[in-house]
């Protein structure tokens, strides 16, 4: 009996190690994380995080089209929003593009349903459009 266990032990160890080799989060999990970070940064009024890590360059360019740097433009547009909340719904991924259905609400405002567009830039998902 012990002899059989001795021969099975290396095989079991290999099976256990094979199960430990996870490849990291799926693209859907990565998109969900980016959208959740967007919600947290918006609620915290962390415009630096939004501009530096979460928004795609094309969206930053659009935000800055009013003649202000990204952070100041966001502060001007979002600064008065109180208690913003974001709930993530369905996520769809098509190669290096993704969309996330979200429900947003804030104090004193009607809730709305929007679709955020994301793009994968060098392995990092960033928000390229704030609603459609």
Question: Which residue stretches match the model-derived regions?
Answer:
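Bacterial N-terminal signal peptides that target proteins for export
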Residues: 1-9
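Surface-exposed, charged secondary-structure patches
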Residues: 25-26, 68-115, 131-132
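Short, aromatic-enriched amphipathic alpha-helices that serve as compact interaction elements
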Residues: 27-45
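Short, well-ordered alpha-helical segments enriched in acidic and aromatic residues
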Residues: 34, 44-61
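Hydrophobic pocket/interface hotspot
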Residues: 38, 50, 118
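Short, low-complexity, Pro/Ser/Thr/Gly-rich segments in the mature regions of secreted, periplasmic
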Residues: 119-132
């Amino acid at each position: 009996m012990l002899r059989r266990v001795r021969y099975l032990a290396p095989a079991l160890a290999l099976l256990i190690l094979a199960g430990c080799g996870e490849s990291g989060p799926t693209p859907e999990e990565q998109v969900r994380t980016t959208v959740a970070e967007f919600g947290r940064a918006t609620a915290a009024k962390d415009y630096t995080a939004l501009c530096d890590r979460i928004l795609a360059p094309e969206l930053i360019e659009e935000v800055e089209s009013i003649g202000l740097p990204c952070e100041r433009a966001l502060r001007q547009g979002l600064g008065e929003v109180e208690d913003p909340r974001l709930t993530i719904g369905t996520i769809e991924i098509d190669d290096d593009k993704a969309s996330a259905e979200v429900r947003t609400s804030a104090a004193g405002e009607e809730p709305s349903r929007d679709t955020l567009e994301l793009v994968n830039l060098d392995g990092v998902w960033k928000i390229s459009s704030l609603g459609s």
